[in-house]
Amino acid sequence: MIQPLFLVGPRGCGKTTVGKALADALERRFVDTDQWLQANVQMTVADIVEREGWAGFRAREAAALEAVTAPATVVATGGGIILAEQNRHFMRNNGIVIYLSAPVDVLVNRLEAEPEVGLRPTLTGKSLSEEVAEVLEQRDILYRETANIIVDATYEPGQVISEIRALLDQMALRNLGGAYT
């Protein structure tokens, strides 16, 4: 069985962009938990949070994670998926977790360039740069503790994918005596 790959990291780190390209490169299926959830409940994340609160959204997010997990799949997760211990445990036990790490300034620049940035409800009520810094400070340790692989996601997607592939191959050689792909 080819294990699923779970991409974790903050908003703007490239989980969806890198995930789609990685899935193509590895000939795997791609799914984004936020997109899957929104399509299945016919509501945006903002609508879910407004109606059910963050706790309701997080519960739906956990269910989405389990629903989309399948062999030979690259899963782009929501930035806060690691907040729930059950999600961290689930990902570690059911696949390989890859943390796409990037500094605050890179994340803010990417988010400001996205037209849908205003569609996501604020977590702190602060400016984008303050919120990104605060949220990353709180979550970075959880991303790092959960990840099997940590990749510098400040580079172009092609470089990030090359690094992921090399690290997956190293991991496979250490664990199995063979290549991942």
Swiss-Prot record:
Pathway: Metabolic intermediate biosynthesis; chorismate biosynthesis; chorismate from D-erythrose 4-phosphate and phosphoenolpyruvate: step 5/7. It is an enzyme of class 2 (transferase). Gene3D superfamilies: P-loop containing nucleotide triphosphate hydrolases. ATP binds at residues 12-17, 120. GO terms for cellular component: cytosol. Binds 1 Mg(2+) ion per subunit. Keywords: Amino-acid biosynthesis, Aromatic amino acid biosynthesis, ATP-binding, Cytoplasm, Kinase, Magnesium, Metal-binding, Nucleotide-binding, Transferase. It catalyses: shikimate + ATP = 3-phosphoshikimate + ADP + H(+). One of its GO terms (molecular function) is magnesium ion binding. Pfam families: SKI. It is found in: Cytoplasm. The LID domain closes over the active site upon ATP binding. Catalyzes the specific phosphorylation of the 3-hydroxyl group of shikimic acid using ATP as a cosubstrate. This is Shikimate kinase 2. It comes from Escherichia fergusonii (strain ATCC 35469 / DSM 13698 / CCUG 18766 / IAM 14443 / JCM 21226 / LMG 7866 / NBRC 102419 / NCTC 12128 / CDC 0568-73).
